[in-house]
Amino acid sequence: MIVTTTPNIEGYQIATYHGIVTGEAILGANVIRDLFAGITDFIGGRSGAYEKELGRARETALSEMEEAARAKGANAVVGVDLDYEVINNMLMVSASGTAVTIA
């Protein structure tokens, strides 16, 4: 499945629009607390463990979005947007886009 942030896919025509699809992943309070503690410990550097955890959450959100697109009969998702939001000491990663069939 092609997933892109652009509104169209070069070399393809959008044959059908299937609507908006989303996927979410939430990191629990302990991960967030540890994440912010780690940030203060790694000022000026990078924490591979925390980046890996955020990457896992992002991949989960994108996978859920792709599954939702497949369920609608789509073979691509265009206009994808990723958002990160802290809610009640938890980090939510959400992915949204428009499910389409390309030809």
Curated annotation (Swiss-Prot):
Annotated family: Belongs to the UPF0145 family.
- Going by the entry's taxonomy, the superkingdom of the source organism is recorded as Bacteria
HAMAP family attached to this UniProt entry: UPF0145
Q: Which organism is it from?
A: Cereibacter sphaeroides (strain ATCC 17023 / DSM 158 / JCM 6121 / CCUG 31486 / LMG 2827 / NBRC 12203 / NCIMB 8253 / ATH 2.4.1.)
- InterPro entries in the cross-refs: UPF0145_dom_sf, UPF0145_YbjQ-like
**In the record, which residues are listed under signal peptide?**
none
Q: What is the lineage of its organism?
A: Bacteria, Pseudomonadati, Pseudomonadota, Alphaproteobacteria, Rhodobacterales
**PANTHER family for the chain:** UPF0145 PROTEIN YBJQ (PTHR34068:SF1)
What name does UniProt use for this protein?
UPF0145 protein RHOS4_20440
